[in-house]
Amino acid sequence: MSLTVSFTGELAAQCSPLISRLGHAGFPSALASGDATLWGPEAVPEASIRLGWVQPLSRWEPLAREVVALREELAGQGITRVVLCGMGGSSLGPEVMAAHAGVEIAIVDSTHPDSLLPLLVDTLAHTTIVVSSKSGGTLETDSARRAFEAALATQGLEPRDHLVVVTDPDSPLHHQAIEAGYRVFLGDPTIGGRFSALSPFGLVPAGLAGVDILAFLEAGEAARLECLSEGSGNPALILGCAIAVDNPEVDKLLLSTWESAPGLGDWIEQLVAESTGKGGLGILPVVGYGL
């Protein structure tokens, strides 16, 4: 599968020189090497510790196999349902992966009783609860964890048999999980949340739900190489220029919805909204249902 990005009209004319300039400057190769100076001198201290997402995805294959083995172990105990407690990218990525694969995963990304209570009152004997937070201190996720711990105890179930934690090393959640005896999968602190779908934060819940995460890693690595390649056809370079072009009349991104990729529009909306506008300028993403 190959990725392509194309556009026409005035936007194409505006982007073409920028694409050429970045290509001649070797931007893709510099990004692939983890060059933290690409965002300017003021950003170097932060960028230098946030570029883990450009590394080869093969690094996560051992973890993926561990997740597959855990799913088989849990299935042997009759635990086949997965609930994911996480906010933003921690839940939207795995949700899209599961929908694409045609497997079920219940998402808890709100503390509203209407979304939480039906899962708490249901029998949890056949359920794995994945608690996912990079910082390990997300209030909504922590509240959901406590609610499920209480519900499990009420049903006479041992929380450590049903809770799986995904967090960064040495976070508050990491320490709490160790103390409670939960299974723990650790992320990479150099990978930001918006880039974490093919790290433990996406792979663990999706894999436990039944997604073929090894296939996702293989496809993701092919896309990574394509998006870090030199040449004017680099899809990431083209899309980045289209979003960043200095045009006061271009400030919105209309996202269609695709039957073949349910939830993808909502995920892209969250990624673009979270990732742009840091300097007072950005793109407003809008999901156009029915378009």
Sequence positions of predicted segments:
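A short acidic, often aromatic-flanked loop/helix-cap motif at beta-alpha or helix-coil junctions
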Residues: L11-L18, P113-D114, I191-S196, L291
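Tryptophan-centered motif/residue detector
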Residues: W53-P56, F148-A151, W267
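Conserved phosphate-coordination/catalytic loops
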Residues: E61-R65, S110, N234-P235
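Short alpha-helical segments and helix-capping/turn motifs at coil-helix boundaries
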Residues: V67-L70, E149-A151, L239-G240
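Extended, charge-enriched "interface" segments that sit outside catalytic cores
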Residues: M1-A75
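Conserved short loop/turn motifs at secondary-structure junctions
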Residues: L57-R59, G89, V165, S256-S260, ...
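Glycine-rich phosphate-binding loops that contact phosphosugars or nucleotide phosphates
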Residues: E72-E230
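Acidic catalytic cores of enzymes that act on phosphate-bearing nucleotides/polynucleotides
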Residues: I49-G52, V211-A215, L225-L291
